[in-house]
Amino acid sequence: MEKKALVYTGKAKKLYQTENAAVLFVEYLDQATALNGQKKDKVLGKGALNNQITSLIFEHLQQQKIPNHFIKKVSEHEQLIQVVEMIPLEVVVRNYAAGSFSKRLAIEEGTKLVTPIIEFYYKEDRLDDPFINEDHIQFLKVATPAEIVEIKALALQINQALSQLFQRLNICLIDFKIEIGRTKANQLLLADEISPDTCRLWDLNTNEHLDKDVYRRELGEIVPVYEEVLQRLLTAN
């Protein structure tokens, strides 16, 4: 399948048309960003790592009967995905307090939450992706009440599958964010990516950060950290 016209450029990916209108080519970029794009650097090797990590995780989730847009990895930096209408929400699932959650509620990082907490953020760069609730979502006509219920159920299903997977890798899934797409048949699918860019991952024994916080907080180089996550995934498969 050939790469055709560029249709979208994001912070860390480019999307291209293919000869099949229902399929897109995704190119993962050697780009690291944080703070809604305010911090940005070229990082050689990062694109290939995120492409491979996301491919492995999406394949695993498909085996767990969790619907997603992934078709296949086609090169070091590229994969094919199903075309969906993206719902402009970031859905965050938190198992432990960390990041903005800890700051907002003055809860120490690493505090285990009694049950997973789901948060919604409106994907709008001009507004810095604000935290919103279900009433806002309905007012903005971003999703229907029935879709909100389905999105929350899907998010918890993904959380369970990912938590079990990372537990086997000696990694604690602190929190993660996902995006959801809508097919022409109005089926909701997991879309975008799941990688150390979108998850907080701590080593179970040392609490070492194995995610983008290493870049965000300037704790070190992210490529060796992402390579460690990939190697653990490959060992598990």
Curated annotation (Swiss-Prot):
GO molecular-function term, one example from the UniProt record: ATP binding
Gene3D superfamilies named among the record's database cross-references: ATP-grasp fold, B domain, Phosphorylase Kinase, domain 1
Catalytic activity: 5-amino-1-(5-phospho-D-ribosyl)imidazole-4-carboxylate + L-aspartate + ATP = (2S)-2-[5-amino-1-(5-phospho-beta-D-ribosyl)imidazole-4-carboxamido]succinate + ADP + phosphate + 2 H(+)
Pathway: Purine metabolism; IMP biosynthesis via de novo pathway; 5-amino-1-(5-phospho-D-ribosyl)imidazole-4-carboxamide from 5-amino-1-(5-phospho-D-ribosyl)imidazole-4-carboxylate: step 1/2
Keywords: ATP-binding, Ligase, Nucleotide-binding, Purine biosynthesis
GO biological process: 'de novo' IMP biosynthetic process; cobalamin biosynthetic process
EC number of the protein: 6.3.2.6
Catalytic EC class: ligase
Family according to the record: Belongs to the SAICAR synthetase family.
Annotated protein name in UniProt: Phosphoribosylaminoimidazole-succinocarboxamide synthase
